[in-house]
Amino acid sequence: MSAIANSAVLVRLNISVWGASKRNKELEHEVARNKKADPQAMRMYDNLMVGSTGHRDVQRHAAQSRLWHTGLTLPWDERGYRLCPTSLFIDYKSQHNVKRATFDRLVDTFRVKYLGYRETAKEYRGDIFNELDYPPLAEVMEKFCWNFTVAPVPQSGHLYVDLPEQELEEVRTSCDQEVERKIAEASKENEKRLLKDCLLYTSDAAD
């Protein structure tokens, strides 16, 4: 078994979220006509969830989770698999479980409030509101997905695996340093957020 197969695993994280937007060609043509412009010169999209935060909360958490995943792993192949050192995997998996639970909770909140969000958007969208822009709830919920896969590092067939031991050791050292750097950056960012929260709390208490 190759040394790298003993010291790392492959992980893949795919997160999808309903876009909650729709291109408004009718409005494009109207604006183009009023401005004496070609409709092809613009793209206008309606925010179907304007006025509420539920969908934005899901989007934000999904984006942060993707960045977190990228920050603790290294590229492996074009299929989306990334390399995670076994020394970090337990902590990685623990954090993953928390982030997935948060995603599921946010998505479930969105599911419960979807119709209410649509009514709120109706107030904001005015004359451009169209009931047909909003898919049935079941169809919308199919757009939300969190897929996580763990796989062993193959014995051969990849540059990292087939490298001679000396070159592989150099790659391994470089990877370890990169992972450590990313962890340090993430820790500093968490410290900044914690300090900011403490300052806000202190300010509120003083008021």
Give residue ranges: language-model regions.
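Leu/Val/Ala/Ile-rich N-terminal alpha-helices, chiefly Sec-type signal peptides and the beginnings
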Residues: 1-121
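Long amphipathic alpha-helical segments with strong coiled-coil/leucine-zipper propensity
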Residues: 95-197
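Conserved small/polar residues in nucleotide/adenosyl-binding loops
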Residues: 201-207
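Surface-exposed beta-strand edges and flanking loops
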Residues: 15-17, 148-152, 202
